[in-house]
């Protein structure tokens, strides 16, 4: 924690400088950032799990407290309005005394509707940053989520401070503990539900604390890209296991994926090993000055090579790419920025005005197309799947004649493969946070 405290000072200074620059540029007196508020379920007295405004948690590691506000102008000490009610029904957050508290002038808020007297009186040149526009309007804000401000902040959030990088390393440490426990639970014959519980136990984080819904898939379920069901019964036969799961540290996310063959031998195990080798090489290809979209193209070339090498498609790799067959087996992007959000912002931006960096032709669904630069953090997550609906579409095209349908049927019980690491780009080196923690 001592290291984080030292790095946090520089982090706050960086956020202050960014705020000062954009406020001067847009003629604003400051930003008022709202943590959010609890959402009640329809016709009920229960609330959905609270998810904090990412602009709020970028300033401080308070991710579980609604009705908080930050008032910041980039020059003066930021003001934190911290919600701390008198409440015998729920746990009340402790008064802030952590390493970050000294960087804020803190005022306690007893009731959400009492916040107006703690906010700037004249709000004409203050911009509200948050989700609840009706609340902002009721409080007298006329400037809400201005696009030039958001574009500027989103663009610069791709450049992580040293504090943020340390938080991401810690998130990876926690997640890797979970992945190792989940792997062991799979090889011990566990169900998807059993594996999920093993993961949560190892990370010491609840399901609601995870940065996204864990994907814990066995056998054919590995072909469902965003599979978030947890089957309580173990299958009669364990073939394969795909886990896409992260962890949270101070509001920053890990996002890691692994795929395993239960028997650790046979053609699917060989395919997993081959994909892992390609994934590692793709990770090593991250270099300042390259466009991330170009790595996505390289990934398709590598997927085509796998399809050819394993006789799934009876064509040389170059022709598989030319005929656009790879998108049937690899229908998503190579990866994305990672930070305070799992799919972190700024991935499509060419500059701080928000100018769009177009994806490569024929690849419209990427989550990142940006120029790679130092202090950025990326996921690298190639995949190869046997998805019934996409294979059905392929079977209606002229390309069906080149598919080894017998081989496809043999692989279907395994569902698919995805391998994902979290990588920091430094000026003259790469830091694979995930593999540095010895997750195979």
UniProtKB/Swiss-Prot annotation:
Annotated positions binding Mn(2+) 2: 244, 255, 420
Gene Ontology molecular functions: aminopeptidase activity; diisopropyl-fluorophosphatase activity; metal ion binding; metalloexopeptidase activity; phosphoric triester hydrolase activity; proline dipeptidase activity
**For this UniProt entry, which segments traverse the membrane?**
none
What the record says about temperature is: Optimum temperature is 40 degrees Celsius.
Question: So what does this thing catalyse?
Answer: Xaa-L-Pro dipeptide + H2O = an L-alpha-amino acid + L-proline; diisopropyl fluorophosphate + H2O = diisopropyl phosphate + fluoride + 2 H(+)
Description of post-translational modifications: The N-terminus is blocked.
Q: How is the cofactor bound?
A: Binds 2 manganese ions per monomer.
Instruction: Tell me the enzyme class.
Output: hydrolase
List UniProt keywords, sorted A-Z: Detoxification, Dipeptidase, Hydrolase, Manganese, Metal-binding, Metalloprotease, Protease
Name under which the protein is recorded: Xaa-Pro dipeptidase
Organism of origin:
Pseudoalteromonas haloplanktis (Alteromonas haloplanktis)
